[in-house]
Amino acid sequence: MIFKYPGGKTYETKQMNKSIRPFQPNYGNRGMTLEEDLNATNEYYREHGIAVIHKKPTPVQIVRVDYPKRSAAVIKEAYFKQASTTDYNGVYRGKYIDFEAKETKNKTSFPLKNFHEHQIHHMQQVLRHGGICFVILRFTTLNEVYLLDANHLIMFWEQQRSGGRKSIPKREIERYGHYIALGYQPRIDYISVVEKVYFSH
């Protein structure tokens, strides 16, 4: 089955364009993407009754379907559609949680081009209705992860629209954001930061 991105580029798995290497565990960051680490973290939270947070499925537009049998359909071609909201949502201590997760190889700033207008609009709506909304930002080269409240992201977004910087300086993320310590279980314990930032008043 062929998957294509909105721009028409064909989706390739790592196995399609790289030779398969034997698994070598790396307990520093375990070689995982931010998404994989967060999915494992959320599974840990659910299993231990801490929070119920899920990743929203990526919307797919089906283009071509074959029917080899009357009772069975086979998808032959589909496109990943651009997500209209954020990556994750759920409930913690009776409050609605909604957040986006992004990573960059940059060491000194986080590019705002990683976010889209519709995501910012969605975050504004969540905040308007009293939900907890934030972004989790990973500097992959430094292996550092931060939680930044959506209000601050929106502030930098508005500054960009007014002719300001097209990225958030790391020093500003350190100033307004909250460092998330990395561990084994859970890998990225962002709920402990959520507890401190949003519930310890």
From Swiss-Prot:
Domain of life (superkingdom): Bacteria
InterPro entries assigned: Resolv_RecU, Restrct_endonuc-II-like, tRNA_endonuc-like_dom_sf
Record's catalysed reaction(s): Endonucleolytic cleavage at a junction such as a reciprocal single-stranded crossover between two homologous DNA duplexes (Holliday junction)
Coiled coil: none
MF-aspect GO terms: endonuclease activity; magnesium ion binding; nucleic acid binding
Cofactor details (free text): Binds 1 Mg(2+) ion per subunit.
Location in or out of the cell: Cytoplasm
Keywords: Cytoplasm, DNA damage, DNA recombination, DNA repair, Endonuclease, Hydrolase, Magnesium, Metal-binding, Nuclease
Enzyme Commission number(s) from the entry: 3.1.21.10
Keyword Cytoplasm belongs to the record: yes
GO biological process entries: chromosome segregation; DNA recombination; DNA repair
TM ranges: none
Cofactor (UniProt): Mg(2+)
Major location (coarse): cytoplasm
Record SUPFAM superfamilies: Restriction endonuclease-like
Annotated site residues (Transition state stabilizer) in this chain: K102
Binding positions (Mg(2+)): T85, D87, E100, Q119
Enzyme's top EC category: hydrolase
Purpose: Endonuclease that resolves Holliday junction intermediates in genetic recombination. Cleaves mobile four-strand junctions by introducing symmetrical nicks in paired strands. Promotes annealing of linear ssDNA with homologous dsDNA. Required for DNA repair, homologous recombination and chromosome segregation.
Protein's UniProt name: Holliday junction resolvase RecU
